């Protein structure tokens, strides 16, 4: 990948000038100027996903400059570098090949001259066999009973991706009950264990190194809980599987290494649900549906890799997002799914985006001080959010671009629930774009029989300025295929922005310092002695903790 400071490109300079030209043009104005705006600013994928980006402060000139920016920042060669296994994660000297995990064509993908696809397919075949044994009831626990509950123990990408997907695809779940434990807070594992029976519970321990503090602490507590009931060490092998590469420690824990599913250092945690880390997904929805998830992602990979920039959905979303943050001043983006099954989708891409692009040092090692990298990502399902934080989106002083996501078809078509849900989905983007003027507010009062003199003091508070940018992502139906495509779409959006920001999107050094300090503090918490080895604030907090515990 080439290291190019985006602000040194001609396109960036053109965008800065263009921003001034557009400064007095609103989204309302743009819709008046361009009669076919919806047709010209929307894209479809596989006739199953519609992405409408027309309600943004952009015109064709904006898009032209943004596309030129992508070209000047060598996006095309960066894409090929990723897909062909170049070590684009330079700070860890690793390839970035989550796309190989869902490479359904089996076209060779080389890392250090070796095709990774045979190993990928071997793990998938092993996962398929394991799923069949668990789901069919062939696999038995220590008392001869079939498995009824699966507890995935992981953290970060080993938890959030599988949890998000199993929740999103609950309509496809089988009889197995899925549970996810991530937090090292003992409450998380304790409350989960209250819900399950040791005789019929399978634990998946998801840790590549089998040394992750939170995961191994929870796994050890689960092991202790099982053995308290089973009273026989041999029971561990019947109730635990590992998603790991550390065979020595897996075996030492008591897990049969035949039930260890490996993945590779070219799979980043937040991009790992497509790997063995997705075993909980495959157990929940069945392996055929897991393959459909991979198929959807693979189709989006092909779209991203080969579709021209003008019709390229992930690239377009990335460029529009970059325009909103770096030229219009937005610091956050909201992801607002109008689908209760997608209730963890925003949290998943909060990790995906912020851990990838939350960087302040560029690929040359220079501090970035003249442009903004990754935005803050947040969100909740609609319509809940409407009764919580939409007030600020509509009438606050902060610009918050939003992605609205909704399925055209519901898995639960109860009465008129879905029409009511979707009426809100459509209404919100219309309200955010077009607002309500003072004159419209006054006309409403007059129509209601009110005197303008009586209501003049309330009128300003009912005005909506509009001109708030949104994308609308309408999915025909949330299926394993479309969900796979949707997730891959956001993954590639993150990649494109990282390329243009000139940062390394696939490391996460920012998580290390806190872990190092926690390891230093942990031994200090074992006794009641006062500490004085830190700053006065940290000393004071630790000492008060010791007094109160």
UniProtKB/Swiss-Prot annotation:
Catalytic activity: alpha-D-glucose 6-phosphate = beta-D-fructose 6-phosphate
One GO MF term attached to the UniProt entry: carbohydrate derivative binding
Any one Gene Ontology BP term: glucose 6-phosphate metabolic process
Intracellular or extracellular location(s): Cytoplasm
Active site residues per record: 355, 387, 515
Family per record: Belongs to the GPI family.
Protein function: Catalyzes the reversible isomerization of glucose-6-phosphate to fructose-6-phosphate.
NCBIfam families: PRK00179.1
Full protein name: Glucose-6-phosphate isomerase
Gene label: pgi
């Amino acid at each position: 990948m080439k290291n190019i400071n985006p602000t040194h490109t001609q396109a960036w300079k053109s965008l800065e000038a263009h921003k001034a030209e557009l400064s007095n043009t609103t989204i309302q104005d743009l819709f008046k100027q361009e009669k076919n705006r919806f047709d010209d600013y929307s894209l479809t994928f596989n006739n199953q996903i519609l992405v409408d980006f027309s309600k943004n402060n952009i015109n064709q000139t904006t898009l032209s400059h943004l596309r030129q920016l992508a070209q000047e920042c060598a996006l095309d060669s960066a894409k090929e570098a990723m897909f062909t296994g170049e070590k684009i994660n330079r700070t860890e000297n690793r390839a970035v090949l989550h796309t190989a995990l869902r490479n359904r064509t089996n076209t060779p993908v080389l890392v250090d001259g070796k095709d990774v696809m045979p190993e990928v397919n071997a793990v998938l075949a092993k996962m398929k066999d394991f799923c069949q044994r668990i789901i069919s009831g062939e696999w038995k626990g220590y008392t001869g009973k079939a498995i009824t509950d699966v507890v995935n123990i992981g953290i970060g990408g080993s938890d959030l991706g599988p949890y998000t997907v199993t929740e999103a695809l609950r309509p496809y779940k089988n009889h197995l009950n899925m549970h996810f434990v991530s937090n090292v807070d003992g409450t998380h594992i304790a409350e989960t264990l209250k819900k399950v029976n040791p005789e019929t519970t399978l634990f998946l321990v998801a840790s590549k190194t089998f040394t992750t503090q939170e995961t191994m602490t929870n796994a050890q507590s689960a092991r202790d809980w099982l053995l308290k009931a089973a009273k026989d060490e041999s029971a561990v092998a019947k109730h635990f599987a590992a998603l790991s590469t550390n065979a020595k420690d897996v075996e030492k824990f008591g897990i049969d290494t035949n039930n260890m599913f490996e993945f590779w250092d070219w799979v980043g945690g937040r991009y790992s649900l497509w790997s063995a880390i997705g075993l909980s997904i495959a157990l929940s929805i069945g392996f055929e549906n897991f393959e459909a998830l991979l198929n959807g992602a693979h189709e989006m990979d092909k779209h991203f890799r080969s579709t021209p920039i003008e019709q390229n959905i992930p690239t377009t979303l990335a460029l529009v997002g970059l325009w909103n943050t770096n030229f219009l001043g937005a610091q956050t983006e909201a992801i607002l799914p109008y689908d209760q099954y997608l209730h963890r989708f925003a949290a998943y891409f909060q990790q995906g985006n912020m851990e990838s692009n939350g960087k302040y040092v560029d690929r040359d090692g220079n501090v970035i001080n003249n442009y903004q990298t990754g935005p803050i990502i947040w969100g909740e399902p609609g319509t809940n959010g409407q009764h919580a934080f939409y007030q600020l989106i509509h009438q606050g002083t902060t610009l918050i671009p939003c992605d609205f996501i909704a399925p055209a078809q519901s898995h639960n078509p109860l009465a008129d629930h879905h029409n009511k849900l979707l009426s809100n989905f459509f209404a919100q983007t219309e309200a955010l774009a077009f607002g309500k003027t003072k004159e419209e507010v006054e006309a409403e009062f007059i129509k209601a029989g009110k005197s303008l003199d009586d209501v003049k003091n309330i009128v300003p508070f009912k005005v909506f300025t509009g001109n708030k940018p949104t994308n609308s992502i309408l999915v025909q139906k949330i299926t394993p295929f479309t969900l796979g495509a949707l997730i891959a779409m956001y993954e590639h959006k993150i990649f494109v922005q990282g390329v243009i920001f000139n940062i390394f999107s696939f490391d996460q050094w920012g998580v290390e310092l806190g872990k190092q300090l926690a390891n230093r503090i942990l031994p200090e918490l074992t006794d009641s002695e006062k500490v004085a080895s830190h700053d006065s604030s940290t000393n004071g907090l630790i000492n008060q903790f010791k007094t109160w515990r």
